[in-house]
């Protein structure tokens, strides 16, 4: 649905026209020909400005039929907005784009070529909503660069945050100062998501993987820059037009800080990075001398001697000499276990349990399984990513498939000599995560929880791990399982050479802190459920990565997770690479609240060898995201 509103001579008129557009529910409004500017809201907003000598469109034409456009101005490199400009560019409009993102706009093919291997063991954690093919840009702009249309001038403002090199544009028409803010803001105190802000925090020596809100500081600086301009109107790339900029930006600043303050209060990184580095992070976002809290360390002690410690692996040793390996991230673990066999500490490795798919826990699991001739166990919901890592795009993805994985259901029990083993779904640090509860008559229960918690809190620092926020999944579900253990238990995170546990009071504090974060996320983002803001893969293409011979017909599935509290009807439209053909497809699908389902397509892939992107648009009530998801395809010669 598009709502068109002409700009005349006053802010009051614009506000009235916005209200009228809402009341008309999509009926087109008449546009007087003498107006300088026309705004059409939609999945991507479209702004047409006509000067005395030239015309320009900001963001793109969206679904409008626009003619005689000289320039199209891009706010950033991301294809989920840039698609709206493609028709105008094809018609001959010249492109203006941020110089800071030149490589991703001009030659994205280089990114995708490197990404075929770079997507494994990826610790940078940047969005891959990147163009498939480069654009010819006529003018690269940085801070202060102008475009004079004749009677109307547009000035570039560097406003990083949503992307590293985002640009906003400032103009003044009839005495009204207007800023076209890109994705800096998406509504009254709201942004589109949080995962887009994941990045390294160099001043604290924190890489992208651990950089929760890593570009929040840049965003806050950009907000302040726009506030200093004292604008009358903000026009974002997506979301509602803002006629009270100061109020909207103040709310956004407050909400970002509230979310980050909540994150710090329960962060596992306090154990690893200590107060000094966490303080640097806090100062960048919250300000100098701002108040924030870090969770004090919980109780911990040395690991008992019947659990062997090696890197991010553990070996559960029975009094019989039999053993069970927990994770295997490198060949040194295999060599260490062989020494235990050689010296008689153990007489057999009976199996391997994998807590989650991350490379530092899985890279040598297949080799260990072959070396010790033993089965590999995992909980059902992440078995496929262990077997077929190339079908996924996730942080820290291992590259070596684990061929034979025994799938266990949540709650399955296995007797292992004097130990009782209970397999658990434990979607903590990542969605694809499990845990193993080990009980014995003589010992307090030991819960192998992968990387989900440390003595200072929860490992939710990488949003792209899919840290969900529903009551019955994610960290709240993990906390409920720990609570069930009572007071006498121990937790093992294999990055920590100790066992540790939380008191009842600490568990309540963690749960309360996370619930506060859920509400902060809800207030900050535009979706009807905050999980969309932290789960980039609520929609994804499966398989994500594919290597095939030319002319292959292959099945692809768009996997949809409905985080909303209502049933959703989805429509999926594929964007095929050149030379591909859609053979069959499920056009629409109904997904109950909280459920997961998919749209299946059979696609004949190109015959010409090369790298390609298959992409898709997703539509539902209140959701219209285009060029949103991708699958990378490498076509090899059929010979």
Map each language-model feature to its residues.
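Conserved beta-strand hairpin/beta-sheet module of binuclear metal-dependent hydrolase folds
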Residues: 29-65, 168-182, 186-187, 291-342, ...
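Active-site HxH/HxHxD metal-binding segment of metal-dependent hydrolases
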Residues: 36, 61-146, 332-334, 340-415
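Metallo-beta-lactamase
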Residues: 55, 146-149, 153-246, 251, ...
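Low-complexity, acidic Ser/Thr/Pro/Gly-rich terminal tails and inter-domain linkers that flank the onset
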Residues: 518-549
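Asparagine-centered strand-capping/turn motif at beta-strand->loop junctions
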Residues: 559-564
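Short acidic, flexible loop segments centered on an aromatic residue
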Residues: 565-579, 618-619
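Short proline/glycine- and polar residue-rich coil/turn motifs
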Residues: 588-597, 635-636
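Short, surface-exposed loop/turn segments at beta-strand-coil junctions that are enriched for proline
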Residues: 604-610
């Amino acid at each position: 649905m598009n709502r068109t509103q002409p700009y005349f001579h006053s802010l009051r008129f614009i506000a009235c026209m916005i209200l009228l557009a809402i009341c008309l529910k999509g009926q087109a409004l008449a546009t007087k020909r003498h107006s300088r500017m026309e705004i059409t809201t939609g999945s991507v907003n479209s702004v047409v400005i006509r000067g005395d000598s030239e015309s320009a469109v900001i963001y793109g034409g969206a679904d409008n039929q626009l003619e005689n456009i000289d320039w199209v101005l891009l706010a950033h490199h991301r294809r989920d907005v840039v698609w709206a400009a493609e028709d105008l560019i094809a018609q001959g409009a010249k492109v203006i784009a941020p110089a800071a993102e030149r490589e991703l706009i001009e030659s994205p093919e280089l990114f995708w070529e490197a990404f075929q291997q770079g997507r494994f063991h990826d610790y940078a954690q940047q969005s891959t909503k990147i163009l498939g093919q480069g654009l010819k840009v006529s003018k690269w702009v940085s801070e202060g660069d102008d475009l004079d249309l004749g009677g109307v001038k547009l000035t570039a403002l560097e406003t990083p945050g949503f992307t590293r090199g985002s640009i906003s544009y400032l103009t003044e028409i009839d005495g009204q100062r207007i800023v076209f803010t890109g994705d800096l803001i998406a509504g009254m105190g709201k942004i589109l998501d949080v995962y887009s802000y994941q990045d390294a925090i160099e001043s604290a020596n924190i890489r992208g993987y651990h950089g929760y809100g890593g570009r929040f500081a840049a965003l806050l600086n950009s907000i302040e820059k726009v506030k200093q301009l004292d604008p009358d109107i903000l026009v974002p790339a997506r979301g509602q037009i803002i006629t009270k900029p100061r109020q909207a930006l103040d709310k956004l600043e407050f909400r970002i800080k509230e979310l980050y303050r909540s994150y710090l209060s329960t962060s596992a990184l306090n154990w690893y990075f200590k107060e000094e580095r966490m303080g640097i992070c806090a100062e960048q976002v919250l300000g100098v001398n701002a108040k924030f809290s870090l969770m004090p360390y919980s109780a911990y002690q040395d690991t008992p001697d019947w659990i062997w410690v090696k890197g991010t692996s553990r070996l559960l040793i029975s009094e019989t000499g039999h053993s069970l390996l927990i994770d295997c991230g490198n060949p040194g673990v295999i060599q260490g276990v062989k020494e235990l066999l050689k010296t008689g500490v153990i007489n057999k490795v009976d199996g391997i349990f994998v807590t989650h798919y991350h490379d530092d826990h899985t890279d040598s699991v297949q080799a260990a399984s072959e070396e010790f001739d033993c089965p590999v166990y995992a909980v059902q919901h992440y078995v496929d990513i262990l077997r077929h890592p190339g079908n996924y795009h996730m942080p820290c993805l291992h590259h070596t498939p684990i061929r034979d994985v025994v799938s266990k259901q949540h709650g399955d029990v296995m007797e292992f000599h004097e130990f009782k083993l209970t397999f658990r779904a434990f979607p903590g640090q990542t969605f694809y995560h499990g845990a193993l509860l080990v009980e014995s008559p003589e010992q307090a229960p030991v819960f192998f929880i992968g990387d989900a918690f440390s003595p200072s809190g929860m490992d939710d620092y990488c949003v792209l791990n899919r840290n969900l926020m529903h009551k019955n999944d994610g960290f709240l579900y993990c906390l409920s399982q720990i609570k069930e253990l009572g007071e006498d238990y121990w937790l093992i995170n294999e990055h920590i050479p100790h066992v540790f546990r939380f008191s009842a009071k600490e568990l309540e504090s963690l749960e309360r802190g996370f619930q506060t974060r859920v509400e902060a996320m809800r207030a900050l983002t535009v979706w009807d459920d905050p999980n969309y803001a932290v789960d980039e893969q609520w929609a994804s293409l499966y398989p994500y990565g594919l290597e095939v011979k030319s002319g292959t017909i292959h099945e692809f599935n768009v996997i949809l997770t409905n985080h909303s509290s209502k049933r959703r009807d989805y429509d999926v439209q594929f964007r095929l690479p050149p030379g591909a053909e859609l053979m069959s497809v499920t056009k629409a699908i109904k997904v109950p609240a909280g459920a997961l389902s998919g749209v299946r397509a059979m696609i004949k892939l190109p015959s010409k060898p090369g790298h390609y992107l298959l992409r898709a648009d997703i539509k539902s009530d209140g959701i219209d995201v285009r060029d949103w998801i991708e699958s990378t395809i490498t076509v090899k010669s059929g010979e």
